[in-house]
Every structure is written in C-alpha cells, then in structure tokens.
C-alpha cells in the first residue's frame, strides 16, 4: 500500500478538521473522513484511500479562488506513463511519485491544467507544460493542499520559469551547501523536455504504447 503520511487515531489534527469541513461541503462522506485516521509517519491522508474515494471529483482549493484538484490517475492527464517514469528521475521526487490528478481553474480542459503528483517526502509537485517544461512544489503535503491551497511561492516559481531563471532538475544541475548536502529547489526545469500533445500525423495516431516502446519521443525526451 502506498501511504505517505501518520499520527495516532486519538489525536485531533487540523487535517481531520479540514476533512470534516469537506464532508459538510459534500466533497466526502462520513466514511471518507475516516481516511485521516489511518496514518503513516508524517501525519496526514492515506493516499490509497484518498484516491479510491475521491477519484473523478473536483475538490475546491482554498487558494487561489476558483482552483480545484481534479482527482484522477495518470491515464486522464496529458502525460504518458513513460513521462511519469522520467519525472521520477528528478532529484526533487527522491525516486518516487504518485500522480493524484490535475490542478487549475475548474473550467479549463484537462490538458490545460497542471499535473499533480505526491513525491517520496509527501510534498505535492506540479508538472507544468510550457516552452520548457518544469516542475514546481505546490504544497508541503496533500493535507496542506486541501486545507490551505497552493503555496504562494508556487506562482513566484511559475514566473521565474517564464523568465528562464530555474535550474535543471538533473544531478549535474544541483547546488550544494558547504557540507556537500543538496540544496532543495522549489522548482526546476525538466531536462531536455519538449511539449507533447496527442497528434495524428497523416492517418497514424501517436499512442502511449509507441512512446513506451521508444519509437517516438515522449514529453521528456527529444
């Protein structure tokens, strides 16, 4: 089971208060609120339970106004499975990533919304498709995202990306402190990333299977 967060059942946390608020807003039912009781070391939602109960729903985010998290699997996003495998190679994910849906204004099409995933440390990352693709830290945890919305730094990082001021997320682009420890970046470019939309050259549709087989480039390979 993939669990990213944990406190004891008897503890009352802000996350459980947030779950109660979502229940009253019709987002989750009484059984859904119980998912905050099964926890792993960091305190928060059980990701498997969350995905099972919320899949296919738009969850309103407190900030910014009008933004939602649409809970879905990678198959309902613009990314291919191969794209996600290369996303996992970025240092910021620590080698582990679970796609949880898309984030953006509720009236946007799926391919115009950022793809959201949970990394090994529990943080929520957004994959942004642009002229040069990049990944941004959207929240320190999934419970924080649901309770407070996107980090204010998220929009600052998106602006930095537009200005060409991010570093690349591969190991050669890492910064280290005086002790040699990696300085974690809140946003980074995806090395050699290219914009990919599903297209039909001639009469042949480019499929996920073709990307996985390596016959044509994915969003993360030239």
From Swiss-Prot:
Record bears the keyword Ubl conjugation: yes
Localization terms from the record: Virion tegument; Host nucleus
Quaternary organization: Interacts with UL25. Interacts with ISGylation machinery components ISG15, UBA7 and HERC5; these interactions inhibit global protein ISGylation.
UniProt family annotation: Belongs to the herpesviridae US22 family.
Pfam families assigned: US22
Protein name: Tegument protein UL26
Post-translational changes noted in the entry: ISGylated; ISGylation regulates UL26 stability and inhibits its activities to suppress NF-kappa-B signaling.
Primary location group: virion
Domain of life: Viruses
Gene that this polypeptide is encoded by: UL26
